[in-house]
């Protein structure tokens, strides 16, 4: 014997259970099937009532702040948070968590509807791929950030990193909930640390669909992509009432931080949307270019646009005369799959174009000069715009395509006072450290440090080609002549004689920066027919697809911010 008690009739092996207990269960009509004891008819009724009560609570919770506040949301031209969820996600895919959460008990919340504690959290699918959601509900306590709601949000961030889901914030919030934070502020603020540590791990999107100030103000600023709705959204470090109390300024939300301010002046917003639905469409489209998390494959789409397609229209769009301007957006439309381009910050720092497109179905980030604005010269804002865009592409292994027609950086007292060296260094730093495939096409001018930052050969270009009009030089021929031959020009007779000499010297200098001389020195991979630019971009991306770079050991680089 092994010391264990033998089973007894109607009992258990150790005799501690059974007998009368089992008989009582049988007498009650429950019986036992495979060791599972069933409930009574009365218990079934009770369970049904509990289920009904649960359903009623959830239905009430989905009513948000109540009919009056929902109507007010619609009067302002805004969708409710739950209508936004329906627009954002593929139909029937959203799973909510924390619906039954409510605000902490305070005198200010007594008798008020505080379902979900003013923030809807959960996961759903966008184009068939999972994404996490943290969406503030302005109908519940003005969407303010409460202790319980932020606990829900923190869990969504944790799970998003664990499961590899992009995080989407739908922002319509008065900010931190003052009545809960007073006396407990030392335990708040985790959101900004968590978002910073998540950066580059999963994509983070902050869609501003209403108020976004104070506590929520930094949320979009820490996101990768920030669309705002025209006319109904605002974003600021402090609300207008706090600003009035602190500075005496009388401002409207729109004047201080409306979509036009951040899309055209500050550069915090990436796009300006017509309405909520348009904004949410932008979120879906942005994520269509992104992997779900770092290391995942990029989403490839089937495409009918032939990779070998030529475009003779480029002969018409880009003038051979380097002094004539043109719209680079027309060039981009000719080169990308089906002419579809998703611009980033199109209304800010306009001398440089950034955005996403596909080549042969594969996502790529496009950085392009815009000769229509200052001939494409790079200033402070353009440097910042490009630096962040390159950062995002590099973080998620999205290849970069550079379309170059740049006379260099803007010079002068104004830009020096604004810190052009510091901001330009940011651009240089990020292009230098980016390890993704880089394909560079030089259409016309590639002068000075502008050439370096726009995917220059020494900055990791994996495939660099030029048109017959390409010029790579420390500066343009005109500038070089003014410096190199200033005494000779000064000695020439003013008027026609001096201009004739200048023209002759410019011709000599231009002959020294002929693209075929550059090709002769093996400083460029090829001179190409402009009509075959798309073909070469796709070839370059295919060639460099397996790129791997091992960086020197270090903790992190010191970005010149």
Question: Could you say what each language-model-derived stretch is?
Answer:
Residues 2-27, 31-561:
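Ligand-binding clefts of soluble mixed alpha/beta catalytic domains
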């Amino acid at each position: 014997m092994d010391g264990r008690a033998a089973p007894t009739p109607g009992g258990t092996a150790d005799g501690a259970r059974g007998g009368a207990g089992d008989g009582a269960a049988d007498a009650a009509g429950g019986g036992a099937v495979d060791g599972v004891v069933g409930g009574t008819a009365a218990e079934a009724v009770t369970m049904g009532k509990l289920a009904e009560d649960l359903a009623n609570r959830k239905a009430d919770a989905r009513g948000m702040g109540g009919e009056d506040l929902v109507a007010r949301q619609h009067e302002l031209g805004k969708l409710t948070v739950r209508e936004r969820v329906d627009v954002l996600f593929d139909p029937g895919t959203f799973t909510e968590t924390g619906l039954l959460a409510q605000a902490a008990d305070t005198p200010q919340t007594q008798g008020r509807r505080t379902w979900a504690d003013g923030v809807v959290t959960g996961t759903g699918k966008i184009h068939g791929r999972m994404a996490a959601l943290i969406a503030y509900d302005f109908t519940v306590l003005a969407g303010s950030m409460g202790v319980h709601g932020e606990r829900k949000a923190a869990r969504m961030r944790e799970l998003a990193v664990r499961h590899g889901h992009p995080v989407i914030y739908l922002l319509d919030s008065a900010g931190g909930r003052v009545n809960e934070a007073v006396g407990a502020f030392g335990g708040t603020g985790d959101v900004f640390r968590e978002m910073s540590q998540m950066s580059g791990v999963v994509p983070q999107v902050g869609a501003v669909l209403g108020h976004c100030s104070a506590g929520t103000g930094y949320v979009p600023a820490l996101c990768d992509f920030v669309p705002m709705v025209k006319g109904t959204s605002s974003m600021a470090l402090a609300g207008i009432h706090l600003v009035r109390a602190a500075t005496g300024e009388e401002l409207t939300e729109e004047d201080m931080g409306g979509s036009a301010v951040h899309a055209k002046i500050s550069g915090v917003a990436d796009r300006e949307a017509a309405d909520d639905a348009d904004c949410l469409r932008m979120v879906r489209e942005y994520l269509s270019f992104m992997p779900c998390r770092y290391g995942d494959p990029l989403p490839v789409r089937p495409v009918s646009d032939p990779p070998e397609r030529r475009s003779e229209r480029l002969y018409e769009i880009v003038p051979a005369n380097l002094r004539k301007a043109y719209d680079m957006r027309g060039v981009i439309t000719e080169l990308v799959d089906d002419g579809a381009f998703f611009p980033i910050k199109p209304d800010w720092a306009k001398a440089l174009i950034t955005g996403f497109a596909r080549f042969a179905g594969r996502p790529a980030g496009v950085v392009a000069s815009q000769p229509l604005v200052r001939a494409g010269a790079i200033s402070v804002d353009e440097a910042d715009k490009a630096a962040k865009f390159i950062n995002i592409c590099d973080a998620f292994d999205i290849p970069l395509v550079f379309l170059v027609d740049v006379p260099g950086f803007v010079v002068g007292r104004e830009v020096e006072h604004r810190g052009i060296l510091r901001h330009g260094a940011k651009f240089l730093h990020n292009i230098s450290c980016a390890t993704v495939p880089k394909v560079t096409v030089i259409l016309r001018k590639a002068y000075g440090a502008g050439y370096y930052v726009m995917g220059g050969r020494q900055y990791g270009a994996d495939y660099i080609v030029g048109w017959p009009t390409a010029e790579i030089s420390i500066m343009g021929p005109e500038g070089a002549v003014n410096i190199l031959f200033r005494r000779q020009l000064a000695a020439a007779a003013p008027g026609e004689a001096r201009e004739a000499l200048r023209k002759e010297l410019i011709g000599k200098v231009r002959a020294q920066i002929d693209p075929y001389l550059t090709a002769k020195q093996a400083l460029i991979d090829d001179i190409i027919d402009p009509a075959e630019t798309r073909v070469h971009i796709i070839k370059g991306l295919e060639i460099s697809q397996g790129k791997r770079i091992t960086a020197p050991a270090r903790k992190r680089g010191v970005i010149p911010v």
